[in-house]
A protein has these predicted regions:
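Metallo-beta-lactamase
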Residues: 1-42, 48-118
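A short catalytic or substrate-binding loop motif that flags glycine-/basic-rich loops and adjacent residues
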Residues: 24, 44-47, 175-178
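Active-site-proximal loop/helix segment associated with metal-binding centers of metalloenzymes
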Residues: 2-16, 66-80, 132
Length: 191
């Protein structure tokens, strides 16, 4: 990522005072109020810096980008596998650790809160395996060509779920597929 790319996609990054930064450790308890504690869980695999947050009281895990993208149409999980940190084994280990929790729902950045966390975690693992296999079979294509092929494959998958063309277009518009290709290829290069 370049500074220009980050600014275009997420705005200007401004410095903050060092004393405002608190180190987070795996398993740390964050007291929300006198009756509620959220547990910080180090959750690498998608990115080395990633944490998920578990609210034992409600059985909710806040996973950010760890699980991928989940749209309202069924349980089709679109992985989020960016460079340089995507690592399948580490991500699966993270997901297996999270599966051991008593979960009632999962909240993800893209998109929403879902009441079938174990099913979605399973679907995420299956989707990641499918994406790796698909992308691994495109070694001679440029990043752009592979990205275009991935989009064609995804559109076919969405259509098989009877999702309308406008919605598919919106879903595809949310993906940076060249970045996904780069993340998977970077991972496969070191296997």
């Amino acid at each position: 990522y370049t500074e220009e790319w980050l600014k275009k996609n997420w705005g200007e990054i401004k410095p903050i005072p060092l004393e405002n930064i608190k180190k987070l450790n795996d398993g740390a308890d964050i007291k929300i109020d006198k009756n509620r504690i959220i547990k910080a869980l180090y959750s690498p695999g998608h990115a080395k810096h990633h944490y998920s947050f578990y609210d034992e009281t409600s059985g909710t895990i806040f996973m950010g980008d760890t699980l991928g993208l989940i749209y309202p149409h069924g349980n089709f999980v679109q992985p989020n596998l960016p460079p340089p940190d995507f690592d399948k084994e580490v991500l699966f280990s993270t997901l297996e650790h999270i599966e051991k929790l008593e979960l009632k729902q999962v909240a993800i950045a893209h998109f929403g809160i879902h009441s079938n966390p174990y099913e979605l975690i399973n679907n995420a693992k299956e989707s990641i395996d499918l994406w790796l296999q698909f992308i691994d079979n495109l070694p001679d294509l440029t990043q752009k060509e592979a990205s275009d092929r991935l989009v064609e494959w995804l559109v076919a998958n969405y259509k098989s779920l009877n999702i309308d063309d406008k919605t598919i277009s919106n879903y595809i518009g949310n993906g940076n597929f060249e970045m996904q290709i780069n993340g998977v290829r970077n991972y496969l290069k070191y296997q």
